[in-house]
Amino acid sequence: TAWPEADYIVGNPPFLGNKRMRDGLGDGYVEALRAAWKKHKPNSWDFVMYWWHHAAELVRDGKAQRFGFITTNSIHQTFNRRCLEPFLANDKKTVSITFAIPDHPWVDSADGAAVRIAMTVAQKGANEGVLRNVFHEKILDDSEISVETSPTKGLILPNLKIGVNTLLAEPLISNENISSLGFILGGKGFKVSLDLANRINAQAQLAFPIWNGNDLT
């Protein structure tokens, strides 16, 4: 669907994470959506990033002056960041974020659940922006949260930070084959009780204990 012409684009697109898109939209819709955007490799994006990308294209091409969205706060994480980087991390910096709050409290209108969101405003060209980080939150009543933020001015990077661009860091060759990140559990479902582990291992050596730094104090 073609968007109507506008100088400014403002929105609060649906909060559907990548893993929940099929549940909320259905397999057919998700497959058709990803096929239509195939050249941008969007399979790991949250639903809201399709809006962000399209608005960024309009601003880059001079068809809109500026856009601002409320999005999931995972916008600055690795998979969603791939949507931002073609606009922000290239030599020409075709689009710049001029205002951002990376992590802000929010109440989901669908079920009243407390969630975290991000806010971004972008315009064409290489421009510095204002980054506001939340440093204090206070619940006033069932529907309101008082929030205090501190501003920083500078070039806002795709990870919604200002300063050294750690996204350009490369792996240390000296660590190759001698350093490992180790095991990371993908969710609470991977944790089992000692009793269940013993019953599993009665048949085969399938479950092993995992320790991290917190267990070695």
Feature-to-residue mapping (PLM):
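Signature of N6-adenine DNA methyltransferases within the class I
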Residues: 2-205
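C-terminal target-recognition/interaction regions appended to catalytic cores
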Residues: 199-217
